[in-house]
Amino acid sequence: MKIERIEVFPVRLPMKAVLTLPRGPSRTLDEGKRIALVKMTDAEGNVGWGEAGPSRRWSAETLESCTTSIREYLAPALIGHDVFDIAGAHAKMNIELASGLDPGQPIAKGALDVALHDLLCKRLGIPLQAWLGAKRAGSVKLARLVSAGTPEEAARIAKQGLAEGFQGFKVKVGHHKEARDVELVRAVLEAAPGAYVWPDGNQGYTLEEAIRMARAFERMGVTLFEQPVPMTDVYAMKKLLSASSLTIALDEAAMGIPYVIELIRREAVESLAIKVSKVGGIHYARQMCDLALNAGLKLIGSGLMDAPIGFAASVHLFAAYGIDDPVDLNGPQFIAEDYLAKPFPVERQTACVPDAPGLGIQIDESKVKRFAL
């Protein structure tokens, strides 16, 4: 039951659109979605897959850093390790690359974590959700991401999303003038009446701006505002909670369990956006979910424009914890082609938890070779 081999395959997946953040476009179409795929094999020939898909303008990791970290430091530390000792695997990885307020190179470590979970669940013949020990739901609803420069474009995206079956819309704000951000959210609300709509500031506002925006969104009937202020500004996060009736969800600030514990102690958090790759994989993501639920915090689901491996891992986790609001797993909106042998099961923008062992997906290794960098 030992890990025998770990291989890393840097790939580029073609994209059909790019996402704009307050710092600018997350990548270019030519750059594509660049991923370090991880194939983990045990002594009996069982295989698990993971992926590191960093967004260099969102996180501190890149494809190059993930590939080097895995090949040179993390993978060698795990060769010969017991596949059922996940905590021990993270302890070894944290010795090689130190953790702090976050797990330290969490996207790279998360790729190995997901591969390890996929492998051990395949050995057991159970889906990942069964390993997590809860089946609060068998599916999760997907949200349509709206990244638009004008209200007209935002309305068009929302109407198209409704026609495709989406009932939730996350609107990117924080990189326009305040009045334009209000117009963008209003346009989506009007174009998609009855849908669940929330703005995501991606840390783009000062405290004073965030308070004004929160009050404007309140008047429109919005109920949740995601990461309006910088993740390091604990004072602003706490102040905003008392200044607004909106639920303030923290995304970038939910980077690791030690920091979240400190935010809870300071009464500066009431909701967390869970990203599997952001926190170092399933092992830490499930701990963060348990911590949040025990502290009375609301959970929302999100991702990093995940390709199918990250998408599947997130669906298993979010369904296990019963996240019922639409989740921002937007990889399929942006990635034109992937490496799966057959598509992930999605019906009317609801992602269903696969019944097959592990992540429940099959990797087409001929496609991995075709997309290789």
Show the residue positions of the predicted features:
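Metal- or metallocofactor-binding catalytic centers and their adjacent structured scaffolds
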Residues: T41-R123
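Predominant activation on well-ordered alpha-helical scaffold segments within soluble catalytic domains
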Residues: R71-A75, K109, D113, H117-D118, ...
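Conserved, mostly hydrophobic/aromatic
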Residues: I3, V38, G45, L74, ...
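Flexible C-terminal active-site loop/helix
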Residues: K2-V18, D30, I35, M305-L373
